[in-house]
Regions:
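Repeated scaffold domains used in trafficking and secretory/extracellular systems
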Residues: 146-153, 202-205
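Short consensus segments that form the blades of beta-propeller domains
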Residues: 84-86, 115-123, 141, 169-174, ...
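Acidic, small-residue rich beta-repeat scaffolds with periodic aromatic anchors
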Residues: 16-76, 80, 171-256
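Hydrophobic h-region of N-terminal signal peptides that target proteins for export
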Residues: 8-17
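Acidic/hydrophobic-patterned starts of short beta strands in beta-sheet-rich repeat architectures
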Residues: 98-112, 154-169, 217-231
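A short beta-strand motif characteristic of beta-propeller blades
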Residues: 79-87, 137-142, 202
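A glycine-rich, hydrophobic loop/mini-helix early in the fold
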Residues: 95, 104-150
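Sec-dependent signal peptide recognition
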Residues: 1-7
Length: 256
């Protein structure tokens, strides 16, 4: 009996001394879940103030668009349209933070440029991010078609916020979403990680074998002064049971 108590005491002592498991990663975003739709409403006066500072000239009505303008036959049609003022821009989202330098109180406006006659192949136009410190425009960058703000985060703790953004493209019933994490330090866009495809959903195509694929992106646990590392797990679900996700790969998702 004494032997049993002795063994139990030793076991309890070992367990007590064993270090608890440490959390070594955090979820950056789970794309199996729909990102919340932006509830931000931009007043008309703010739209005018921001757009006037970002664009030298622009249109306020699609009916005023022209197909024949200077540079309309150039290889870069969208750039020519912007230069000619042939666009009907609008602010689609906004977020506050410290984006270009630490310790700032700034507002970032996401702008759908909507160049005149931009086609489906052009993703219906470019997207820009305009960052203001008070009334001053401090950054105006193209987002490379990233048209939604998914999350704001300061991953390395340097006081500068990064933005996780995504884009979506639908073709023949196949939905593809891409995502990037970018910093706007010093007023320039720096892509910290291009995650590639994070959603591939073919359910709307209603073809044999159609399914839904989505990524969960993790970042290493916060450590001051260290750059974060990322891991990606990819899940698949049938169109009939969209909530029953199964892990099928790790790393970047292979395009269908």
């Amino acid at each position: 009996m004494k032997t049993i108590f002795f063994i139990l005491a030793i076991t309890s002592s070992v367990i007590a001394q064993r270090p608890s498991a440490q959390k070594n990663r955090d979820v950056l975003f789970d794309f199996r879940k729909e990102p919340p739709a932006s509830a931000v409403k931009i007043p008309a006066a703010t739209q005018r103030t921001v757009l006037t500072k970002v664009f030298r000239r622009y249109l306020t009505n699609q009916d005023k668009c022209k197909s024949d303008f200077a540079g309309s036959s150039s290889d870069d049609y969208l750039a020519a349209a912007r230069k000619a003022g042939m666009m009907v821009p609008s602010i689609t989202d906004m977020i506050t933070g410290s984006f270009t330098a630490a310790g700032q109180t700034q507002t970032a406006y996401l702008i759908s440029v909507s160049e005149c006659n931009a086609s489906h192949a052009d993703n219906f136009g470019t997207t820009r991010l305009a960052i203001f410190s008070g009334p001053q425009l401090v950054a105006d960058v193209d987002t490379d078609f990233m048209s939604f703000i998914v999350r704001k985060i300061d991953l390395d703790g340097n006081g500068i916020d990064e933005l996780l953004m995504n884009s979506s493209y639908m073709g023949q019933g196949n939905l593809t979403e891409m995502a990037t994490l970018a910093s706007f330090e010093n007023g320039r866009r720096h892509v910290l990680n291009d995650f590639g495809s994070v959603v591939e959903d073919s359910c709307a195509a209603a073809m044999p074998g159609s399914n839904s694929k989505a990524a969960v992106i993790y970042t290493s646990a916060f450590a001051p002064g260290l750059k974060p590392t990322f891991t990606q797990e990819n899940y698949v679900a049938s169109c009939r049971n969209p909530r029953r996700w199964k892990l099928f790969s790790k790393g970047k998702m292979q395009e269908q």
